[in-house]
Amino acid sequence: MLTINETRLLNRIHALGAVGIDADGRRTRLAASDEDKAGRDLVSRWMREAGLTVVTDYIGNLFGIWTPEGCAETEPVMTGSHIDTVINAGQFDGCYGVLAALEVVETLKASGFVPARPIAVVAFTNEEGVRYAPDMLGSLVYAGGYPLEQALATVGTDGAVLGKELKRIGYAGTVAPGFLKPCAFVEAHIEQGPILETEGITIGAVEDLQGISWQRITIEGEQNHAGTTPTVYRADAGLAAAKVMTFLRSRCELPGSRTVATTGCIAFEPNAINVIPGKAVFTVDVRNPDAAQLCAEEQALADYLTELEKTDRVKITTERLSRFAPVLFDEGIVRLVEDSAAARSLSCRRMTSGAGQDAQMLARICPTAMIFVPSVRGISHNPLELTHDADVAAGANVLLDVVAQLAAK
């Protein structure tokens, strides 16, 4: 049975992981930054050394394309992920999917395999969304879900315009996003959660992806003295915010619920120890893999906020920041993942992706699925992020099988 070169793949993961380390030892490659350029340059070099045609589109998505003779007009199989990172990141998130994809192509080429269609390795721009919003921007533009000009005009957290930054680092591209129309997309990725490791399973066949609803909620009460204002007379914006958070947790704990909810950002005004908050501003991240259930959670929150205004004598306004519907991946490709795992005697289970991924955007335009490998202790977006070498190789070998079967058709 054909297998990837584990040593080469691991060496590349570590080499790319060494790019963007600052003086404090923190790994950060924000989209379109100098550090991102250095990572792109390295991956581009590896693509060229593998004999691939390297192309960048106008949003900065980077492609390495293998086009065997006679199939240039055939829709390609596409595989990859992203190489931009969060601040103080691990070395596997996204990078594993890009480098596993490159390893798959090199292995297939060396084996004498002749695909019936091109195979394209891709590193999408700004998946993390740390510097530029929204996240998964490169794949979203590629799939036609966001206007190119609007994306290029996006202003980053540092005031830099994305289009200008892509030009500055030399990755503004020469072709329009969507120039390749894939017949299928497969993304290998670390799980970024604890399920596979906890259950002792090597491969996750990802069958769907949670819908995501982001809101910013502003609660206005009455700023007042913490010592002289009796509880009954208070319009405490801080307390009202806390009630919203506990309400969301209670929804997650309902029997059979698949909802998860997070308040990741919060600010009180005036933010003083002896002053009742007159204002609270916080974010809400609600996720569920079922479209109807996600809508139900959004409505339940809206109803609760309406009631809370009355009971706590506060004014509440909401702002939608982002919303992505749940995604159901292609059953045929999910089965290919399961079949490959079985053929290689690897334990496997079907899974839901709890995180947003580039694959959810590609699912808009072609059959798509994902392959998960275990994350040690479920840790990600953290320098402690780790996937064991054997699992790295196992996931890449499953990707090898799936890509080969899709490209042979």
Residue locations for each model-derived region?
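His/Asp/Glu-rich mid-to-C-terminal helical/loop segments that flank catalytic regions of hydrolases
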Residues: 207, 225, 229-255, 300-301, ...
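Zn-dependent metallopeptidase/amidohydrolase metal-coordination segment
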Residues: 9-22, 80-81, 348-398, 406
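Midchain, well-structured core segments that form catalytic/ion-binding scaffolds
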Residues: 127, 131-291
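Acidic, glycine-rich active-site loops and adjacent beta-strand->loop/helix elements
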Residues: 60, 83-85, 119-130, 192, ...
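Flexible, glycine/charged-enriched surface loops at secondary-structure junctions
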Residues: 57, 114-118, 173-177, 228, ...
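A short beta-alpha structural unit
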Residues: 29-31, 262-271, 283-290, 315-334, ...
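Acidic/His- and Gly-rich active-site-bordering loop/insert found
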Residues: 3-89
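Alpha-helical metal-binding/catalytic segments enriched in His/Glu/Asp
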Residues: 79, 88-128, 213-219, 225-251, ...
